[in-house]
């Protein structure tokens, strides 16, 4: 941080392990990647082994790995989701991007379980799919444990500034390259 300003993070999409490594090699501060399930990129299909390898690689260079768990989760999938979240915690990913609040509930349960285990819980990032358009929504997300909020893509710079003024302690993320990830 310089002069009270936060450093801008260069966050790159990684459709697979190779793209993630290339992004880090070319200066990305962080990458986001989807697993085989629960990611909005249906074609991602990355194994947990690939995500673990990317996480190890990224951490060698001080970069972060965020995993997208940003689809609607159905009741019958909750046990699979919990298993995935456990794997992500244990491999040391830096954050989980969330759409469905069922992920939040399982995360809270795991946080209580892992509290004394030596594992660090990944940060929670609210995906743009949670339709983050207002200071009130950002407040609610913060109160529920989210450290970063990915704002709706349609917001103006003025609207983003107003949200930041209302919640300067919450990390805000905005897409700057268009509507596609």
How would you name each of these model-derived features?
Residues 4-31:
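N-terminal basic/disordered segments at the start of proteins
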Residues 9-13, 31-33, 65-69, 94-98, ...:
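Hydrophobic faces of well-ordered beta-strands that scaffold small-molecule active sites
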Residues 14-18, 37, 69-73, 102-103, ...:
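Active-site-proximal loop/turn and secondary-structure-junction residues that shape catalytic pockets
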Residues 23, 100, 141, 163, ...:
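Conserved, mostly hydrophobic/aromatic
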Residues 31-50, 68-76:
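Glycine-rich, proline-tolerant flexible connector loops at the mouths of alpha/beta enzymes
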Residues 57, 63-140:
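N-terminal active-site wall of soluble small-molecule enzyme domains
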Residues 62-63, 119-120, 136, 159-181:
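Conserved anion-binding
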């Amino acid at each position: 941080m310089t002069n009270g300003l936060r450093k801008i993070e260069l966050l790159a999409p990684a459709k697979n392990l190779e793209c993630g490594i290339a992004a880090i090699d070319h200066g990305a501060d962080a990458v986001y990647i989807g697993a085989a399930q629960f990611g909005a990129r249906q074609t991602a299909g990355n194994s947990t082994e690939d995500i673990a390898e990317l996480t190890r690689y990224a951490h060698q260079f001080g970069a972060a790995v965020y995993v997208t768990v940003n689809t609607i989760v159905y009741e019958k999938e909750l046990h699979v989701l919990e298993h995935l979240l456990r794997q992500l915690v244990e491999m040391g990913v830096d954050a989980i991007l969330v759409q469905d609040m069922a992920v939040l509930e399982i995360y809270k349960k795991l946080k209580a379980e892992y509290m004394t285990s030596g594992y660090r819980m990944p940060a929670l990032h609210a995906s743009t799919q949670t339709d983050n358009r207002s200071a009130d929504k950002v407040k609610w997300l913060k109160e529920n444990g989210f450290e970063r909020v990915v704002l709706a893509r349609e917001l103006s710079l003025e609207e983003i500034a107003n949200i930041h003024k209302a919640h300067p302690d919450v990390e805000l993320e905005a897409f700057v390259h268009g509507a596609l990830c």
